Amino acid sequence: MTSIAKAFVEKAISNNPVTVFSKSFCPFCKAAKNTLTKYSAPYKAYELDKIENGSDIQAYLHEKTKQSTVPSIFFRNQFIGGNSDLNKLRSSGTLTKMIAELKENKSSIL
């Protein structure tokens, strides 16, 4: 893990309302991004298999979140988990509320 990876992750989750660290070939990542798109969530995805230092970024995410798999999803600066966690939020109705809150406060987080 490098300080470059840490800086990249921290900047990404600070600058985006919703951040998804993903891999382009991962079906769980695709499902999570599809869910966020369906709910019109203002998200930014980073494909770790396509960017420089992707493995270092994933190592830092593991250190930060204790989750070794992708997707790693953040709402504002809060880690919410992976695709199964996103589906739990969707099923409970919480996801809709979280996205509405993000959109209402968009100017303060963008």
UniProtKB/Swiss-Prot annotation:
Q: A GO molecular-function term, please?
A: glutathione peroxidase activity
**SUPFAM superfamilies assigned:** Thioredoxin-like
The Glutaredoxin domain sits at: 6-106
Q: Which Pfam families match?
A: Glutaredoxin
Alphabetical GO CC annotations of the entry are: cytoplasm; mitochondrion; nucleus
* Biological processes, Gene Ontology terms: cell redox homeostasis; cellular response to oxidative stress; removal of superoxide radicals
Q: Which InterPro entries match?
A: GLR_AS (IPR011767), Glutaredoxin (IPR002109), Glutaredoxin_euk/vir (IPR011899), Glutaredoxin_subgr (IPR014025), Thioredoxin-like_sf (IPR036249)
Disulfide bonds, paired cysteine numbers: C26-C29
Q: Which UniProt keywords apply?
A: Disulfide bond, Electron transport, Redox-active center, Transport
PROSITE patterns in the record, alphabetically?
A: GLUTAREDOXIN_1 (PS00195), GLUTAREDOXIN_2 (PS51354)
> So what family is this one in?
Belongs to the glutaredoxin family.
Check the record and name the PANTHER family matching this protein.
GLUTAREDOXIN 2 (PTHR45694), GLUTAREDOXIN-2 (PTHR45694:SF27)
Described function: The disulfide bond functions as an electron carrier in the glutathione-dependent synthesis of deoxyribonucleotides by the enzyme ribonucleotide reductase. In addition, it is also involved in reducing some disulfides in a coupled system with glutathione reductase. Thioltransferase catalyzes cellular thiol-disulfide transhydrogenation reactions. It transfers reducing equivalents to cytosolic protein and nonprotein disulfides.
Q: What is this protein called?
A: Glutaredoxin-2
Q: Which organism is it from?
A: Schizosaccharomyces pombe (strain 972 / ATCC 24843) (Fission yeast)
Taxonomic lineage: Eukaryota, Fungi, Dikarya, Ascomycota, Taphrinomycotina
